[in-house]
Amino acid sequence: MLSQLNISATTPLGATIVPGGATFRVFAPRASAVYLNGVFAGTTYNAQSQDRLLSKDANGFWAGFQAGAGDGDQYRFWVDGPSPNGTQGYKRDPYARELVSTKDNPFPNCFCILRPSNSYPWYDGGFQTPDFSDMAIYQAHIGTYSINTSGVSSNFLDVA
């Protein structure tokens, strides 16, 4: 099982770069197992083995710490659905800051790219959240709208 170093109830969802590596946390309450696969510090991990297993808490959050992980590393989750007949397969991190689709790993099985939370500049310093009653909330999965199929990372500007 992956280390629980730097993991707590307040660990952010998604991948977060911290000193010495990165934390990974995902909500999958019905999963029977969640594994972290990817390329970290030049080493490829592509197995559903005990040493790649994330730890599940009582609320359905799976988490682990990958030592040596850093900016630019690629990752994705392998999720085993609920037993006894659950589906299984690779899943992207819904909190990923960047995705890359390649010939060998096309969308939707593409890799997420580990990026620091401050890697994208925001130009909205004067923004103020409107009253909730004035909001229209939409959820869009950016990877669904990707126009890059040549192995180049997609980003939010691709859907603008």
Enumerate the language-model features and the residues they cover.
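Residue-level detector of conserved, well-ordered beta-strand and adjacent loop positions
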Residues: 27, 37, 55
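The feature marks proteins involved in alpha-glucan
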Residues: 1-19, 23, 44-49, 53-139, ...
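Beta-strand signatures of extracellular beta-sandwich domains
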Residues: 33-37, 76
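Short proline/glycine-enriched turn/loop motifs at strand-loop junctions of beta-rich domains
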Residues: 27-34, 70
